[in-house]
Amino acid sequence: YKGQLRTSADQSWAVDASVFTHRDSLYLVWFGIPEQPIPYIFNCIYIARLENPWTLATRPVMIGIPDQRWERHDPEAAFSMGSPQPLKSPDGNLIHLVYSAGGNRPPYSALGLMTAQSGSNLLDPASWKKSPQPVFCQNDTLGVFGPEHCSFIKSPDGTEDYIFYHARYRLEPAANDLRTPRLQKFSWDKKGFPVFGQPIPCHVKQPKPSGTAI
């Protein structure tokens, strides 16, 4: 244990951080409350370069604010985007951040995408471009509701990509106890953007990840 990773002097809200390496530098992304209040905005996405795994080397920079229409659906909550997870394109030319937004409950919650060119300044908000629509939404027909809070892993042999996320099997808005972890394979388009498809219900059998020993 090395100590608390402080993102601000006043220890304000900073949640669901993730790290990634780019051009020999270590970066931290997370979501938190803006230093200066923004009407109807609760959480935004931040980035900073790290001096080491427990110390920021730069001041936090806000790179994402919930300003898309689909991110502002929930009529009973302050607008929020969070849980950013880094994902590099197969050729390394793009750095994606996949994030949760739309409210922390179905039917609004979904995954969005922010993208930067690998040669850009990742600490410049202008480097990040948002997808205008969510990239992973609930599947009403098959009964998968409110997908959010994802991460990414490879198959054992490294040839396949998988998204790991949680979702609900019923539509009750506040039923966090109904959330279950899900795993499914995804692909890439020719431009280096992830193609997640639709959430798959838990009862649907899927092929084992390539290289699985059992």
Predicted regions and their residues:
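Carbohydrate-active catalytic/glycan-binding domains of CAZyme proteins
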Residues: 1-214
